[in-house]
Amino acid sequence: MELSCPGSRCPVQEQRARWERKRACTARELLETERRYQEQLGLVATYFLGILKAKGTLRPPERQALFGSWELIYGASQELLPYLEGGCWGQGLEGFCRHLELYNQFAANSERSQTTLQEQLKKNKGFRRFVRLQEGRPEFGGLQLQDLLPLPLQRLQQYENLVVALAENTGPNSPDHQQLTRAARLISETAQRVHTIGQKQKNDQHLRRVQALLSGRQAKGLTSGRWFLRQGWLLVVPPHGEPRPRMFFLFTDVLLMAKPRPPLHLLRSGTFACKALYPMAQCHLSRVFGHSGGPCGGLLSLSFPHEKLLLMSTDQEELSRWYHSLTWAISSQKN
């Protein structure tokens, strides 16, 4: 039944018109960006993957490590684009969702891909020359292979934004409303899983870096399974005597205090010796001074069952960042 309005303006009809304009604008953006995305996928598939296969410059395991599921993702885009061009958004995106697992696989391989690229550029002269030659093609517009490799993960975020907007601006009586709503949900769930994979990879990188900075028997396995939050120098204020600089590494469950090795140490110069581990679940944190945000720095008090730490910094902003990170770590252990 059509709604009729006695006046010249009808709020319901105006709202529908706004939805339709937003829907049309979003659909147009999805189509235009998909064309560009598919073009870039095709450039890599043609000028890198295809030629590398033909020339044998990289062995199949190395090629697979570098590009992962790229060709299958390219195929999924080739399936989707005709539906978008024909205005069959719901049907096209419903079919596209069957390929979302490819993006999970691509994300899980992304760190290995970047590592393989750097290793091969360093040690494989033929591959290095080939990459430079292909990157110089005008079709790439100055983009390097390392800039193009994250493209599918960037596109997944665009998919989420655009498909969610498309679903939100599609009325419940539209024939493709259910298809678009389901596609938006599945794409958002995939984007969240990919984000989680990326966060874990970044954390693993931090843990390897921190573990490499620690030396000595006590340091073995200290970072295994932990979630890194921050690190930096702070001054430890003892009951008597002068404050001593120490390096601190904060994880969600512990605060690690480390002392720098002597610079002239034959084997371990530039590393740190672990001096203490403080459990965040048993920590009570307070600011002794440094609440005002002034230029004079501040002092934090960390109380544990058998010890109390006073940590000082002359940088007020840095101390505030530490305070917020410590607060978050303590809260995460008590929830």
UniProtKB/Swiss-Prot annotation:
Chief site of localization: membrane
GO cellular component terms, semicolon-separated: plasma membrane
Pfam hit, one: PH
Keyword vocabulary terms for this entry: Cell membrane, Guanine-nucleotide releasing factor, Membrane
Domain PH, chain residue ranges per copy: 227-331
SUPFAM superfamilies: DBL homology domain (DH-domain) (SSF48065), PH domain-like (SSF50729)
InterPro entries linked: ARHGEF39, DBL_dom_sf, DH_dom, PH-like_dom_sf, PH_domain
Role: Promotes cell proliferation.
Gene Ontology MF terms: guanyl-nucleotide exchange factor activity
Compartment(s): Cell membrane
GO biological process: positive regulation of cell migration
Gene of this entry: ARHGEF39
DH domain boundaries: 22-197
PANTHER family: RHO GUANINE NUCLEOTIDE EXCHANGE FACTOR 39
Tissue: Strongly expressed in hepatocellular carcinoma (HCC) compared with their non-cancerous counterparts.
Disulfide bonds: none
Protein name as catalogued: Rho guanine nucleotide exchange factor 39
